[in-house]
Amino acid sequence: MSYQSLLTHRCDIYHLQEKKENRKQKFGVPVEDVQPVFSYPDEPDIENQPCYFTEKSQSIIQQESNVSIYQSFLVHFPATADIRVNDRAVWDGTAYKLQKPRKIRNHHWEVTAVREVEYL
């Protein structure tokens, strides 16, 4: 049984990109000093990426006016996958933000994926 056959899930990967917009000098601030704007593209950079999600933790936090649910998953990717910090992975219609990937013995990637949902 190969490692590739254990990656039974499929997800779409979106790389975080700097938004190239028409910047003009505003209020006397030079364009080079303006904070960059980042966003995810509409189309995935990688479609149907083989992976495997395992739930790491889940917590519910009661705040003053609402409830927040934090979920984290440990996600496995093959070593050939192009995975970066702050990528968005969409698995079964749910979006997760990927944290710093770790390459395990030059064999595969392990990444923590986080999801935060607020309910009113």
UniProtKB/Swiss-Prot annotation:
The organism's place on the tree of life at top rank: Bacteria
Which Gene3D superfamilies does its entry note? Protein of unknown function DUF3599
Q: What protein family does this chain belong to?
A: To B.subtilis XkdH.
Protein's recorded name: Uncharacterized protein YqbH
- Which species does this protein come from? Bacillus subtilis (strain 168)
